Amino acid sequence: MAYPVQLGFQDAASPIMEELLYFHDHTLMIMFLISSLVLYIISLMLTTELMHTNTMDAQEVETVWTILPAAILILIALPSLRILYMMDEITTPSLTLKTMGHQWYWSYEYTDYENLCFDSYMVPSSDLKPGELRLLEVDNRIVLPTELSIRMLISSEDVLHSWAVPSLGVKTDAIPGRLNQATLMASRPGIYYGQCSEICGANHSFMPIVLELVPLKHFEEWLLSML
């Protein structure tokens, strides 16, 4: 859950998001070390009068500044590629949820069950109950089980949308005529908020996403009440 004046990421609630946070810290440390080294060299150049005016060739230096950046790029690329493959991997999902974007609401269909589908609209500010969040609450939440692999099938009925839930590390474009796929697995119960992350028209800001992640037993009880 985000909070005002937040500078960092939201707390990770899925294995994918945890990996993304580790990769962010890994890359940020490399960037910090490189920036510190460059600033140190610049400060030396500005504060000293020593210089080599007759240097015409320095093969050792050229070799170092060719090999070192290549090694750094490899250190960044390898974990990045690993996470990309993890995000695309779909292994025998326990549940499939089809998501369709509209101007300006979402519709959901639990494809493993017959006639279990609904639309999800933002709750107007005038109808909010105490404790509910402005521009983030919906009339019908998605209810999903925790610790199970869930396949998301995402598309759009009209224009480009993007289905994004930061805490779960999910952001997939909803494109008309194309069915995109994503994996979702929550590591703990909770209510997670997201929004459409692709400018899609006048009411783009009013397309919230709310996921209620519950233990499997509670999910089965919810299913019985909906079917």
From Swiss-Prot:
Gene3D superfamilies: 1.10.287.90, Cupredoxins - blue copper proteins (2.60.40.420). Cu cation A2 binds at residues 196, 198, 200, 204. One of its GO terms (molecular function) is copper ion binding. Its cofactor is Cu cation. It is found in: Mitochondrion inner membrane. Its EC number is 7.1.1.9. It is a multi-pass membrane protein. One of its GO terms (cellular component) is respiratory chain complex IV. The chain crosses the membrane at residues 15-45, 60-87. Residues 1-14, 88-227 are mitochondrial intermembrane. Mg(2+) binds at residue 198. Its main location: mitochondrion. It is an enzyme of class 7 (translocase). Coiled coil: none annotated. Component of the cytochrome c oxidase, the last enzyme in the mitochondrial electron transport chain which drives oxidative phosphorylation. The respiratory chain contains 3 multisubunit complexes succinate dehydrogenase (complex II, CII), ubiquinol-cytochrome c oxidoreductase (cytochrome b-c1 complex, complex III, CIII) and cytochrome c oxidase (complex IV, CIV), that cooperate to transfer electrons derived from NADH and succinate to molecular oxygen, creating an electrochemical gradient over the inner membrane that drives transmembrane transport and the ATP synthase. Belongs to the cytochrome c oxidase subunit 2 family. This is Cytochrome c oxidase subunit 2. It comes from Hapalemur griseus (Gray gentle lemur). The lineage of its organism: Eukaryota, Metazoa, Chordata, Craniata, Vertebrata.
